Amino acid sequence: MSRLPAALRTYRLLAAVAGPLTPVMLSRRVKQGKEHGGRLVERRGLARLKRPEGRLVWLHAASVGELASVLPLIARIAERGIGVLVTTGTVTSGGLAEQRLPRGVIHQFVPLDVPRFVRRFLAHWRPDLALFVESDLWPNMIVEASTRRVPLILINGRISEASYRRWTYLLGTIVDLLGRFDLCLAGTQGDAERLSALGAPRVIAAGNLTLDVPAPPAGAARLAALQSAIGSRPLVAAASTHPGEESALIDAHRRLRADFSGLVTLIAPRHPERGAGVAELAAAAGLKASLRSRGALPDATTDIYVADTMGELGLIYRLSPLVFMGGSLVRHGGQNPIEPAKLGAAILHGPHVWNFAEIYAALDKSGGAAQVDDGDQLAGRFSAWLHDDTARERAAKAARETVESLSGALERTLAALEPYLMQLQLPRRTDHA
């Protein structure tokens, strides 16, 4: 590549200068529960494990959602006998990696985007191919991998309208970064057009891999126990909620319980460590809340059941006939609606869903989902669907059929990756530099 743009040079300089300050920052994040205290060395580019022999694909997925979307892809690559290293950046994604990665696939927390940390990481793992998921584009990681001539591919690529507008103010930087990618596989046609406009040289609209991920599992015993505890009481659920949304849900519950005796509202905060705070909000509103993390099941007096545990959304989506998807009444961009749609739930969401705009648009158009703009509309739609089983079931059926019609991204992605994966299975002619 030619000389780096000024903004990118400045970023690299500041990141290098910040390197000595990272121990203090990481220590603070450990106290906040945002880092794995026993694995901080990985954030500085050090490895706990040896590099496996042979060719190695490095796949980077920022967090839980991104990792979940590529689990089937990881399995298909590993089945070919190619080594796979997966990096993620959050404690919760590390937990998911431990639970769900195929045997033999290595997980490491991604190094902070400090040049010497990234170089240390690359020198140890020596990847033969790098796959970046969605939009987690760390400049030093991309520049250093490109400098080592590692082929770079963006998979499930996503650039929202808001991100696109922001990047236009740093056009030279994003053109440089995307120009280092051999291939960008976009999640939607809109993403493909935005990636091309920002300088990606080769873009294919392969589709959203999340649509091909199997529905999340639910342990039969746990499902039966929770179903038994709730019994025939009316139930609504809210998944992956963010601060500011739980108060609207609690207020909706207070307004609805007069019409729906025994109503249970199940709230699964996006970050489980916020569970106790959600319970306090309910108590302040005069409602009784119980926390799943403490082993509680809802009893006859429970109003708000807080599912502050990891890996149980599959259970929640199977239980609740209708689900509000969080991150959408507040300006977060929305959470992924595909899993509840696959499991037969009618879906509600707020207006702020730019992270999954095209999927929500398809669901809304088919009647599988409905938008609510505030707490009043949320309570009203909950009430309408609780009163009308036929309308709710029709919406759930439309949601399921919509996501089924949009599937196929996994095979298209594998087809696009085939030349690169085939190359890794050929005898090595020279050692990796």
What is the predicted role of each segment?
Residues 1-433:
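Nucleotide-activated sugar donor-binding and catalytic core shared by glycosyltransferases
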